[in-house]
């Protein structure tokens, strides 16, 4: 992984974004003053930058294949601390195709109602 700027990214790159999120917490004033920042990490597919009033980094999380609808995080660029390129677009597409091929080769066993044992989670 290497640190990159938004300008270096191409749509389809797999990225990890470290950014500061707004939060609400109840604690003493000392704790508020000691560490007020809350950092988050989001990773996914870079979909671009958008926004009218503020520029937002779009990070794709999942896609509904039938409609080609993307679920995405919309992160204000001014809150981004760093962006790491996990895998360039070309390698990401290759990895996804390999995973899809593996999924087609895996056979799932169907269980009948009487065959399933009850499991108690403690």
Briefly describe each language-model feature range.
Residues 2-122:
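Conserved RNA-binding domains used in RNP assembly and mRNA/RNA metabolism
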